[in-house]
Amino acid sequence: MAAQVLSGHEAAEAVYEEIRARLRSLSFTPSLRVIRLGEDPASVAYVRLKDKRARALGYRSQVEVYPEDLPEEALLERIAALNADEEVDGILVQLPLPPHIRTQRVLEAIHPLKDVDGFHPLNVGRLWSGGKGLFPCTPLGVVRLLKHYGVDLRGKEVVVVGRSNIVGKPLAGLLLREDATVTLAHSKTQDLPQVTRRAQVLVVAVGRPHLVRKEWVREGAIVVDVGVNRVEGRLLGDVHPEVAEVASALTPVPGGVGPMTVAMLMGNTLEAALLRRHGASG
C-alpha cells in the first residue's frame, strides 16, 4: 500500500483559516518587519514568500533591504529601533547573514516578544522549561502537520535525525511537550539505521539528499522529511522516495514541511502581537 501523502499546503491552509478567524475578533492588525541583507537568490525568494503571505492575511508587512556589506553595528542599531517601535509586533532577520556579521549577536538583539523566528535564548529556555513563548517555525510546523493528520504523539517513539538549533533541538523540545519519547540522532550516532528503524515517527533534518533509504525505516512508520537540497536544478529531500514503499505516511519535498514553516511564522506574528498587548494569546 502506498504511503499517505502528508500535504503541507493542506495543513497550512487550515492554519491560515484559524488565523483569519482570530483576526476578525481583534481590534488591531499585526505588523511584521523583515530585514534582508544582500541579494542572495534563495533569501530573496524566501523573503518575498513571507511578505506575500503576511499581506494576504492582512498583516502590515514591510521588507527592509540593506547592502550585504552593512556593518554589524548598523544592523544592531536598526534592530534596536524596531524593538522600541510600538507599531512593530514581529521582527525577522533573514538568515544566513554575511560572514562579517555574528549571527548569534543579531538573534540575541531582537526583543524576545518580537522574535517571530523563535531563536532568542529566552524563547529557547521557555521552550525547554514548558513556558509560553515564541518558538522556531519549522519545528512548530512539523508538530502541527502531524496533528493536522491526526497523529497522536503521546507515548510514540519519535526519532529526530539532525541536531541543529533551527530544527532538531527545538523539535525535540516540542515533541517532549507532546509526551513523545524522543531520540535525537546526529552525525556521530552509532549505527544510525538501527536507531531510525525503532521510530514510529521519523523526522529527518540533516541536509543530505536521499540519505534515508527504505531499509532505515520501520514498516508503517510516519516519516517527515525536513530536508531541502538543490541538486542539478531539482529540490530533493533527505529521504529517498523508495521509503514510500514501507512508510504509512510521508511528507513530499517540496510541498511538505516548507509551507508549514511559513504558516507558523504567520502564527508567531499573531502570537507576538497578542503577547505584547495582553501577555497571552487570545
Swiss-Prot record:
Question: What keywords is this UniProt entry annotated with?
Answer: Amino-acid biosynthesis, Histidine biosynthesis, Hydrolase, Methionine biosynthesis, Multifunctional enzyme, NADP, One-carbon metabolism, Oxidoreductase, Purine biosynthesis
Which biological process terms from the Gene Ontology are attached to this UniProt entry? Answer: L-histidine biosynthetic process; methionine biosynthetic process; purine nucleotide biosynthetic process; tetrahydrofolate interconversion
Report the InterPro entries cross-referenced here: Aminoacid_DH-like_N_sf, NAD(P)-bd_dom_sf, THF_DH/CycHdrlase, THF_DH/CycHdrlase_cat_dom, THF_DH/CycHdrlase_CS, THF_DH/CycHdrlase_NAD-bd_dom
Q: Which residues does the record give as NADP(+) binding sites?
A: 162-164, 187, 228
According to its UniProt record, which reaction does this protein catalyse? Answer: (6R)-5,10-methylene-5,6,7,8-tetrahydrofolate + NADP(+) = (6R)-5,10-methenyltetrahydrofolate + NADPH; (6R)-5,10-methenyltetrahydrofolate + H2O = (6R)-10-formyltetrahydrofolate + H(+)
Query: What protein family is recorded?
Result: Belongs to the tetrahydrofolate dehydrogenase/cyclohydrolase family.
Query: What quaternary arrangement does the UniProt entry report?
Result: Homodimer.
State the protein's purpose: Catalyzes the oxidation of 5,10-methylenetetrahydrofolate to 5,10-methenyltetrahydrofolate and then the hydrolysis of 5,10-methenyltetrahydrofolate to 10-formyltetrahydrofolate.
NCBIfam families in the record, alphabetically? PRK14173.1 (NF010770)
What is the official name of this protein in its record? Bifunctional protein FolD
Give the source species. Thermus thermophilus (strain ATCC BAA-163 / DSM 7039 / HB27)
Q: Which gene encodes it?
A: folD
